[in-house]
Amino acid sequence: MSKETPSEDDSRHRIVAVTLDEDSIGRSGPDIEHERAIAIYDLVEKNLFAPEGAEGGPFTLHIAITGNRLMFDIRREDGAPVVTHLLSLTPFRRIVKDYFMICDSYYQAIRTATPDKIEAIDMGRRGIHDEGSRTLQERLNGKVHVDFETARRLFTLISVLHWKGNA
């Protein structure tokens, strides 16, 4: 008997709401706040999110930093707990640090640099973002099935949590 592969078109395998722990969010500028808002909107609009062993959703997701761990508190739409996963932040530290450095360069470049320089920086930014997304998919393997685009949006949220100097 083959295992059912979750589908993005299946409303049981999706996130319908995302919240970020306010205590985990560091102070950030308007560019980061804007990225956070867009990432949440895009994630809720289109995602594939299927916790292993859960009978289906849709789900809500609360993301927090707890000690040196990333916490995914997954619940059903009605608030019933499904599972909480704690992931070590260690595999993300260098990636997030690099991502913030290149984002700073990108935001400075879009104000003054040539289009070629902006494009080169943006390609680097996307490459680091992809690396973080793949790392997140690997860390969630066996816990939550997510497609690459969902992992990208989740990585953006993890990055913009900007865990108070711990990155």
UniProtKB/Swiss-Prot annotation:
Transmembrane segments: none annotated. It holds the Pfam family UPF0262. It comes from the Bacteria. NCBIfam families: PRK02853.1. Belongs to the UPF0262 family. This is UPF0262 protein Nwi_0248. It comes from Nitrobacter winogradskyi (strain ATCC 25391 / DSM 10237 / CIP 104748 / NCIMB 11846 / Nb-255). The lineage of its organism: Bacteria, Pseudomonadati, Pseudomonadota, Alphaproteobacteria, Hyphomicrobiales.
